[in-house]
Amino acid sequence: MRALCNELAVYLSKAFYRHIFPVTVCDIVILAIDAAEMTSAEKHRSASATAADARLLPFVKHRLGKPYRTAHLAVTERSLYIIIRLFAHDIAHTRTERTRFHIISPFVIIVTQIVLPRLTKKHFAPYNERIDNRNMTRDMPLGDLGKGEEVMKEFMLKYGCNPNQSTSKIYMKNDAELPIKILNGRPGYINFLDAFNSWQLVKELKEATGLPAAASFKHVSPAGAAVGLPLSDTLKKIYYVDDLELTPLATAYARARGADRMSSYGDFVALSDVCDKETATMLAREVSDGVIAPGYTDEALAILKTKRKGTYNVIEIDPNYVPEEVEEKDLFGITFSQSRNNAQITEALFENRPTANKDLPEEARRDLLIALITLKYTQSNSVCYAKDGQAIGIGAGQQSRVHCTRLAGNKADIWWLRQHPQVLALPFKDSIRRPDRDNTIDVYISDDYMDVLAEGVWQQFFTEKPEPLTREEKKHWIQTLSGVSLGSDAFFPFGDNIERAHRSGVTYIAQAGGSIRDDNVIETCDKYGIAMAFTGLRLFHH
């Protein structure tokens, strides 16, 4: 039986990748077992039989006994999966598996290649209604998903973090409706982790600053976060938006994406406000997995639906949704329960300033808010450098605090070096695309610059060979960076963090405090005239 299931699964995955619900061998084998259990479900109410009965039995009773030649009336992306279930039922109930497979296999080929493209809603409305009544969200076709009209209490995913984790879904434990609509695409497990974390981040940024906010997420940590402050001509150029009209929301995303373009490649985007045409236009030309926002204008949605050949993930979230106070997480079969992190990050956290310099101007307080709110949704340990309304360097998920400070500082240095006149003037060939330019610039400003400047190599990228940036030139340029704000998700245990932060222009710091070496940290701040606030608030996130 497994060989037969594998043959059908391989065919479907090759023929209809990205066009139907992804079918795995495991799916079909499990469904075959479920179907076999159905025959005894009334007598033996096992948990698996009950689950199979609840989801499949009504439709199977309707379909069983009818010749396959009439089954095409039920064919959609949704009901194709039902047909596969019926095929699994046949396998489970016949001893002539090979014969039956040769009967059904051509049928699947015919209906998917010939019948399916020609059907309209009127052909399968009765079947869809039955399936809708069973809340079979897993079988919802992409077309219906695109309308955002379905009531969803659960959403079945292709797989979990990895393809071998085949059983995966999102759902509400209290049987409530999910606070989202899938307007386009089919987001995956990690997409949703990014979406829900990043949405909280931008929502809080908007509440804290009163400005439109955006975040660029990768692997459940932000690569960038920002609010919608105007851009200088230099920033417009290095963010590749100097040819676009920019609204405050579009500017916020330009900043979030531009902070660390190497890490933001293939990001998931969060927007605090309704996505407008200008922001959608910017999104459409970047390599990105999806976006979450409280709404989309008609023009914006039309633009986004054309991205990635129509598969771009577009999620609309209810801006008024408030989760329960207690959250749970399962690990190794053990459930963890805790109160949600409802800590409010406001300027009141900056009142305790133990350093000699106690001056925190308005711009610094704003940037410190951005840094701390960003850290609240960054995998710990984490440190964030911020300037001019945006994160410019985020160090995430490091076991060592000083390594975190170095990582984030190096990213801030790269952000600043990209604004060096010599980098701005790099003579790229017109054919070199943005991702390749980003990669080339990243190497050019590193110590490995000869990887793109060697003879026979530079000709691939440039119209003429650029002069390298020397180590001294880079050091001198970085020394011109100033007014940077730094946040940490916990206390700094040693003054070495301050030493490293100072080299990247840090003038203002907000950290929890509470280290037994706080005096050493304060002394190092005073050495460089840095103003530091003890917030008394730890922001670990796991």
What are the residue ranges of the model-derived segments?
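Short, positively charged and aromatic/hydrophobic N-terminal segments
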Residues: 20, 24, 28, 81-83, ...
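Flexible, glycine/charged-enriched surface loops at secondary-structure junctions
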Residues: 208-216, 314-317, 380-387, 417-428, ...
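Active-site loops and adjacent core secondary-structure elements that bind or stabilize anionic groups
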Residues: 136-349, 364-382
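Short alpha-helix boundary/capping segments
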Residues: 40-53, 89, 94, 525
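Glycine- and Gly-Pro-enriched alpha-helical subdomains that act as flexible
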Residues: 223-261, 392-491
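Intrinsic low-complexity, disordered N-terminal segments enriched in polar/charged/small residues
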Residues: 15-17, 25, 51, 66, ...
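Residue-level detector of structural "landmarks"
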Residues: 32-42, 64
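C-terminal binding/interaction regions
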Residues: 271, 287-306, 310-313, 321, ...
